[in-house]
Amino acid sequence: MSKRLQVFPWITILFYTSKSQYWNYMTIPCTPTVGYGSHNISLHPLNNSLFQDDVFEWYIDKPMVTNKLCLYQSNERIKSNLDSPNIMWQCTDNRTLILMNLTTTYSRNYYFQSFKYLGQGVPKPNNLCYNVSVHFTHQTHCHTTTSSLYPPTSVHDSLEISQSFTSTNFTHTAVHYAAGNVEAQHDTATSHTMWIIPLVIVITIIVLICFKFPQKAWNKFTQYRYSGMLAAA
């Protein structure tokens, strides 16, 4: 009778534990976690549970015995389930679950549970859920086409335009230089005329004096006047 009384508390504990795990898994929110194809991802346990609990478990899809991936008890790794298909994982000593070489089959829910096994009363599990989604990165090449409002100009056309522009500049410079020369020559001729005319006048007077032209002209004038006076008398 005493043995039955000793076994009854353990049966009650196991019953409430399984019931508590079921309802917790149904109500616990899952943290979205993104992984990338062909890479690994690490899922970490609850930090506060590492100090107060002594049983730790990792599950896939939902907390059931057949879905258990890792089991730690009394700070030791007891079990790693190798029968779960289509995924590769590793249970580390610090209670971290590592999912390796991710593919689309890893896009599932992963549950972490911990509770204190030794002690009195019904254990209350601490739960954590990760909702893993696997993404694949693809390299995309973008080609940008730039349209222009102006038609393309060939190299030959550019050279012709450049040469024409150069010739125009040269012609304009030559005309301007020629006009400047004409103006300068006109100014020079004007200045020469201004001093040549007086010089010619002076030279003419000197020549007339040398040939006694004024004396001869005066004599002619006197004779003409005297002849006029005789005719009048």
Swiss-Prot record:
Signal peptide coordinates: 1-20
Coiled-coil regions listed: none
Topological category with respect to the lipid bilayer: Single-pass membrane protein
Location within or outside the cell: Host membrane
Main location: host cell
Segments passing through the bilayer: 194-214
Glycosylation-annotated residues: N40, N94, N101, N131, N169
Keyword annotations of the record: Glycoprotein, Host membrane, Membrane, Signal, Transmembrane, Transmembrane helix
The organism's place on the tree of life at top rank: Viruses
Any one cellular-component term (Gene Ontology): host cell membrane
Family the UniProt entry places it in: Belongs to the HHV-5 UL9 family.
Name of the molecule in the record: Membrane glycoprotein UL9
Species of the source: Human cytomegalovirus (strain Merlin) (HHV-5)
